[in-house]
Amino acid sequence: MTVTRTDTRPFGIAYTALAAAAWSLAGILQRQLHMGLASQLAGRAVFASLAVFVFVAVAERGRVIPAFRAIGRPGLAVAVLMTISSGSFITALSITPVADVMVIQALAPLAAALLGMLSGEPVRPRTWAAMGVAVGGFAVMAGAPGRPGLAGTAFSFIAMFCYAATIVVARRKAEVSMAPATCLSQVLVFAVFAPFAHVSEMGGVNLGYLALMGVVQMGLALFFLSLGARLIPAVEVALIAQLENVLGPLWVWLAGLEYPSVPTIIGGVIVIGAVALQVTQGSGARARLRRPPGDLLGDARDPGDCTLKA
């Protein structure tokens, strides 16, 4: 069925904004944990993989194995990219101030735009302008005291590039359900870090924070991203998701763990303005989807749909 892009675009924006809000909890939740990095990653991966697996089982009406087989090479690529991005992002947060990591994540729209161009996606002049404003806002935020170390910078860039690549693959392969790929990515994270984790560190309050990181900050965020990336161009997804980088430092500030400088506040306002510029952009372009835009809970057995069947 053919539907207008203006019909589906609000849903793509909403899904991506929800992903950004969930992702923004990473810094504040990570700061509450008192355990080694391997235990953090392995523990979060357990909850994330279980949450997404349950979703896949319900959405596919018990046909879990066929669902995982259907992802093919694109789904495997997304799973690997998500694995690397997840591990690198939390590693960066553990050794670098939240605001510094967020500044580097702001480059994702540019990376996604370049990758999208290579795969044939057009980029409108207004989108380029909005991206420039967003990056400029984070450049202002970078004026805050302190610079990230080499290791923190490296892990932040790795996470950013893998995140951008995930957006492009998900958009270009809209017929592939990314829910099983999301689950697989967390299984891979667990497999990599579990041998170095310590179960004794995961009790008490730590267990609750790990559950929040796995189910909300990781599982739901990646799921909403996979939905949003199928409804709007890769570069728009990457730009709207920059709200994560504004909200992340905000939560840490509200908790009294880090206090933003004036440049950070000014930069955050600029970024919000850039996002507003992008999401209010009208378009008469058309896109072909397998379901009507009003069917938010479409048939998940359709390989082109990773949403839940009510």
Where are the regions that the model predicts?
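Structural signature of hydrophobic alpha-helical transmembrane segments
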Residues: 37-48, 90-108, 149-161, 205-218, ...
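Loop-to-transmembrane-helix transition segments
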Residues: 11-19, 63-90, 150-159, 194, ...
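C-terminal-most transmembrane helix of multi-pass membrane proteins
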Residues: 2, 45, 242-310
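C-terminal transmembrane-helix exit sites in multi-pass transporters
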Residues: 56, 91, 108-129, 246-266
